[in-house]
Amino acid sequence: MGTARFLSAVLLLSVLLMVTFPALLSAEYHDGRVDICSLPYDSGDCLRFFEMWYFDGTTCTKFVYGGYGGNDNRFPTEKACMKRCAKA
């Protein structure tokens, strides 16, 4: 039973790394911090339905958020997205 748990943990960690690592590589960094507006679109997990906004590099675009996971390039309103991400 211990081996099965270990293999499950290794599999879970592998999946998390495969999902997270490419997103971090594609992000821009400023002063050592991730610029959340440069993170890729990510609808998250689960099957809930929340209308949210993300910055696509040019403008804010509406999308459906699943309710769990995803990344910080997610805003409750277009105004909040533009305020945080649009360059003046």
UniProtKB/Swiss-Prot annotation:
A GO CC term attached to the entry: extracellular region
Stated role: Serine protease inhibitor that inhibits trypsin at a molar ratio of 1:1.
GO BP: envenomation resulting in negative regulation of voltage-gated potassium channel activity in another organism
Domain of life: Eukaryota
Organism: Cyriopagopus schmidti (Chinese bird spider)
Expressing tissues: Expressed by the venom gland.
Assigned keywords, A-Z: Disulfide bond, Protease inhibitor, Secreted, Serine protease inhibitor, Signal
InterPro entries the UniProt entry points to: Kunitz_BPTI, Kunitz_BPTI_sf, Serpin_venom_toxin
Name assigned to this protein: Kunitz-type U15-theraphotoxin-Hs1b
Propeptide segment residues: 28-33
Location in the cell: Secreted
Site residues (Reactive bond for chymotrypsin), renumbered to this chain: L47, R48
Family under the similarity heading: Belongs to the venom Kunitz-type family. 03 (sub-Kunitz) subfamily.
PROSITE patterns xrefs: BPTI_KUNITZ_2
Residues in BPTI/Kunitz inhibitor domain copies: 37-85
